[in-house]
Every structure is written in structure tokens, then in C-alpha cells.
Amino acid sequence: MSDIKEILSKYKTIAMVGVSNDPTKASTIVMKYMQEYGYKVYPVNPRAEGKKILVQEVFAKISDIKDQIDIVDVFRPSKEVYAIAEDTVKIGAKVLWLQLGIRDEKAKDLMEKNDIKYVENKCTKMEYQKYFLKVRQAFPVLSD
């Protein structure tokens, strides 16, 4: 089993950092999708603290969440990742997941030192679809 498939099978609680209250943003679409497939997703956005996104209370930072977090899923620029990685270690999360286009070598090293799984430049929604949903290819009907 691949590491990603194992992560998505084993861990079901996600702190999603950088979720927007705009329903057209990728972060909100991914959050809704993961909720629909059985994941408990906590939105983290300091600008929306105390509000609700997709019926979930929004937290300012991951350390404000009282429940145990398995995956910290990041929708923030790479330059902000290391601070989030430090918080990931502090809360005892099992995985730091960086969305498409996001990378941080120092964060990767920190995760390795603390035995925390690290995924970069991958979308949780797309990876879930790849491993767990066998979508039939739709072909257009051709006519004369």
C-alpha cells in the first residue's frame, strides 16, 4: 500500500489550514469533499475565527482545536509552512500535508526528525479520488 493510500485510510481527522469562507475557493471545495467522504475537518483561518465554514467552527490556529488531529492539511504559501510544521509537532499530528504547489525542505526535515509523515505538492481530494474512487471514463456519443 502506498504511503498516501495508507494515510487516507488510517487517519480521519484533518485540520485544514487556510480554508476560505468563499465556497468557490479550492480549499473550501476540498474541505466539503473530504467531509462528504467521512473525514472530520476543522477549518483553520485566523481571519474567520469563531465563524462557521461548512457548519464547522473556524479556529485561529491548529493548537486551538481540542480534538486529536491526524492530518494538518495546508492551503497557505510555502513561506508560511515552517511555522505550521512546528505547530504540527506540538499538537502531535501524524501527517503534515501540503497542497499542490506548496513545498518546504526545512518543514520536511522537521517532520522526519519527529517521525511525522510528510506529503507535499498533492491535493487530498485528488489523491482520495485516485485511490478510492474508480470513476468510469465517459465518452461522448458521436453522430453523423
Describe each PLM feature range.
Residues 88-111:
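ADP-ribose/adenylate-binding Rossmann-like module
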Residues 66-67, 105-128:
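Short acidic, glycine/proline-enriched helix-loop-strand junctions
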